[in-house]
Amino acid sequence: MAQVINTNSLSLITQNNINKNQSALSSSIERLSSGLRINSAKDDAAGQAIANRFTSNIKGLTQAARNANDGISVAQTTEGALSEINNNLQRIRELTVQASTGTNSDSDLDSIQDEIKSRLDEIDRVSGQTQFNGVNVLAKDGSMKIQVGANDGQTITIDLKKIDSDTLGLNGFNVNGGGAVANTAASKADLVAANATVVGNKYTVSAGYDAAKASDLLAGVSDGDTVQATINNGFGTAASATNYKYDSASKSYSFDTTTASAADVQKYLTPGVGDTAKGTITIDGSAQDVQISSDGKITASNGDKLYIDTTGRLTKNGSGASLTEASLSTLAANNTKATTIDIGGTSISFTGNSTTPDTITYSVTGAKVDQAAFDKAVSTSGNNVDFTTAGYSVNGTTGAVTKGVDSVYVDNNEALTTSDTVDFYLQDDGSVTNGSGKAVYKDADGKLTTDAETKAATTADPLKALDEAISSIDKFRSSLGAVQNRLDSAVTNLNNTTTNLSEAQSRIQDADYATEVSNMSKAQIIQQAGNSVLAKANQVPQQVLSLLQG
């Protein structure tokens, strides 16, 4: 090895080793002071990335556990409110059982109804005011997603329902049949629920009116009023329009003792084209079985021609010049005797007029308006109803009434209309009006109406309605109990996962103090030795002086 002065290689090597050891000592001191094995990416690039992902998961799962606990609180709050609603329903059921017995006076029933109404109002109050962190949990149908994981899509859904007297089917619940039920103001949601067709702010809703029947047309007739009607004669052939008088006592329509043309007799007894009707003609007590054709011709039951003789009687001898071939019109016009014709359940009794041959006086039985009309006839005086083939026709199969090509319906006010749709308008303030600007409401049956209230009626099968309401509450509470248990399980799992991830992260990221203290001690000793050796190395160039002094 050459002896030089300018470069002290031993000193340089020693300094380099001291610097390396200094870095190791610094790293050990940093790890011991922070408690972390990885203080920056240079310590362990891959380990730092893995540990950082663990940090995200751990923090996310910790928050998810808090979210799940909040979800449990929501379910508990909702279930607690439902418990109170159930208590009110049980009391209402108890009162309903009490009201169902016949020993109650009207005053007793009124008192029971008052408490029932108060209980229903309390149910509505609980529904509208039960909140969790400002969220109404029983005021509307909806779902609340609870994030129970550190990643997207890791949720549990709490299904919430609107629970009030309306959704429970108890709006207007009544045990005494008195008072009125306030309808609720209609909203956009009600129009949407009615499957409305929307154009701008106009919502067109199918009204669901019932098809009008003949009885609906006759509903306005009162005692003594007349109805102009086309009545089927029993053979499927419609007669021309005739006035019928309504008798409120017997609830029947009749056409009695009417003076009319002899030809009018045929419209009650003439069968359809191609058909033949069999019946009996009785003249002054003498009966004759006959056949009547579609043109009104009268023949014997065996098909032989019949004639009317000068006395007004039927005969088979057609040789006399004074005989007239028998027909309904000639029989009525030429006969001055009491005559009755019975065919197909329709009976006409008439007497001809010898002075005015073309005029007869007769009464009709059997050709009455359909029985369905009787049930809907009401006392509305002064209302004459025109019911003719020119105005309305009745489908013989369904009984539905049509007007031209349009079907006729009965609206909610029992008025006739050819439209089965109703237009509603959504205003800027959220209110709903009809075409006339009247406010629109929703009644207890969910129908849209302009009536602010509906006359109360005793609820049909009230105990059944209450049992169904209680059952719906039980079902909702069961679902909330199930979701509470699920969330509780989720919290336990989240805590376990967080613990395991934290341990895994610690193994990667945290400093091992035993190892690091050993490394620090080693580095300190080496540092001290290095400093001593460096002093010795720095003295090596002085050996060259001994050569110069020699």
Curated annotation (Swiss-Prot):
Keyword Secreted appears in the UniProt entry: yes
Compartmental location: Secreted; Bacterial flagellum
KW NAD (keyword) present: no
Single GO MF annotation: structural molecule activity
Domain of life of the source: Bacteria
Record keywords: Bacterial flagellum, Secreted
Gene Ontology cellular component terms for the protein in this record: bacterial-type flagellum; extracellular region
Protein's job: Flagellin is the subunit protein which polymerizes to form the filaments of bacterial flagella.
Annotated protein name in UniProt: Flagellin
Source organism: Shigella flexneri
